[in-house]
Amino acid sequence: MDFQKLKNSYRVHKKKYSLVLKPFNVPKYKKTYKTIIIVPFRDNKFQDRKEQLDKFIPYFQKLFKGSIDILVVEQSEDNRKFNRGALLNIGMLLAMARGYKVMISHDFDLLPDKIAKEYYLTYPFSPIHLGNMWKEKYTYDRFIGGAMSMNQKDIIKSNGYPNDFWGWGGEDDALGIRLSKENISILKPQNGIIREMKHEDTKKIKELRNLTFIESVMKDNNTW
């Protein structure tokens, strides 16, 4: 199958499983639960990832004043590409074993403002796409990457992220299809801002990308 046919097939495939996206404002009365932010991490020679992580942790500690815990799951030097999905799944399993009811998957180069903070402290009765507040880079509705808050029940029901996506790209699309199959809608915050710490765009670095992400997403749908 040539690349253009594959891309067209992928578009049809995504339309078949339409995401249910709902605008969402912070409720007036919020009930808090034990919450943890799970950060998948892997340093590389192309970007200042360690420096970003060193800024990320104290920023969140100051912003949330101990109301949310942080778990960093680091991939070893295994001579393979970054596997964000597998790292997040590991983090979620560890978090569940420790009694956390709310798990937020979060890229470590994204920093929320004080308004966005309120969505982090809101129980996700349905997944809350916190990354929707990251407007400087992604503005299309189907984007569900960057940061996602989910409750334990929805994580188990959707089976989390795929474990076999190596390199940047695709695991969020696969999660979206899994959620769609289980009729789980995604809430989109309408206020607040998330800003990205500047670094070289991963999409431009071939060595870091998942070069078969379209095939990977389609395969995940057919086998999951």
What are these regions (language model features)?
Residues 134-150, 157:
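A recurrent flexible, glycine/aromatic-enriched loop bordering the glycosyltransferase active site
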Residues 1-20, 30, 164-167, 173-224:
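C-terminal catalytic/acceptor-binding lobe
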Residues 98-113:
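Short beta-strand-to-loop acidic/aromatic patch adjacent to the donor-nucleotide binding site
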Residues 33-39, 60, 69-72, 91:
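Hydrophobic targeting segments
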Residues 114-137:
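Conserved donor-nucleotide/metal-binding helix-loop-beta segment in metal-dependent transferases, i.e.
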Residues 54, 66-100, 135:
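Active-site-proximal specificity loops/subdomain of glycosyltransferases
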Residues 1-58:
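N-proximal low-complexity "stem/linker" segments adjacent to membrane-targeting elements
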Residues 143-151, 162-163, 169-170:
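A conserved catalytic-core signature of glycosyltransferases
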